[in-house]
Amino acid sequence: MLCSIYKSSKKEGTYLYIPKKDDFSQVPDALMQMFGKPSFVMVIKMDGRKLAQVNIDKVRESLNTDGFFLQVPPPPVNELELHKERKAQQNVQDEE
């Protein structure tokens, strides 16, 4: 199975996977509006391959059921909240 990958012109780190190059007919209009102008990245062979950011089985399933897969970046890490949590844990340990 081949898959074409496009990156979003509006949302950094967002990628759209579709089964046929330049065929966005299965992608909802609202999603295309949010995605912006797709910029072609590459075509990949899905068989026997791993992807860095997403589970390839989820991509395959979505391509087969929905006709596309949308990869969004993970949410940013809130360093301030992490620091507060570490500090609170440290204070609890110091009290023990």
UniProtKB/Swiss-Prot annotation:
InterPro entries: YcgL-like_sf, YcgL_dom. It holds the Pfam family YcgL. PROSITE patterns: YCGL (PS51648). Disulfide bonds: none annotated. It comes from the Bacteria. Residues 1-84 form the YcgL domain. This is YcgL domain-containing protein VS_0884. The lineage of its organism: Bacteria, Pseudomonadati, Pseudomonadota, Gammaproteobacteria, Vibrionales.
